Amino acid sequence: MLADGEIFLAYRLRRPLGHGRGYAVAVARSTDGEHFDPVTMIYKEEMATDSLERPYLVRTPDGSWRLYLSCATPGTKHWRVEVVEAAHPSEFDSRRSHVVLPGDSKTGVKDPVIVRRGDEWHMWATCHPLDDPAEADQMVTEYACSTDGITWTWAGVALGGRPGHWDSRGARVTSVCFDGGTIVAYYDGRATAAENYEERTGVAIGTEPTVLAAVGTEPLAWSPYHGGGLRYLDLLSLPDGRKRLYYEMTRPDGAHDLRTELQ
């Protein structure tokens, strides 16, 4: 996000399966959008979690900062979202975190995307079914609204997978823009469980935040390497009218980089 003349970026650090998974979340800042200096780090041990997923950083109307953290409940397929708040990102303290999206015995909740417009907070969060552990990789994006960004009212599924398409196994919204009367969302999709961690990016549109419809029959973007993963795309509007994109992309060796483009 852009604040006080700088770009602040929240991201997670991840090791391969069996070697730690998402072991930390970092917040860094930059003056050019490409070269970042770390501001703070939160490690998975501090959050009593098996893994940390993509975080989300917001600023409240009173100027304070919030970092929403997706946490894997140890020994389960369950996910929850906690939040920490501080006057500045450098002051985030994991000891002050509290749960805002607990999920339940049937649903894991993670990867919130949050947009505040006026007095209303909009959120799209990824939900995973827990009834059958073998199917827990399936995902839909549900929408919720709030007046404070802490207590949320759920309104149901906004975007799900499409049978027979490249995103049939699930859809995870990663970025949302309000453009006049149209809502444009970017999302991760996959067709099979084997494509977990190698999702590709699609685009969906709608006129209401509660209902988004995928556009086209093919992904918008993917990596040319290995499993083809290009995911967690986010879009930042700059003061000069250009946009900066950030996304995770699979490299030739199978590792994932965080990359940026200026458009």
Segments from the language model and where they lie:
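Beta-rich carbohydrate-recognition and catalytic domains
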Residues: 1-50, 58-111, 115-169, 177-228, ...
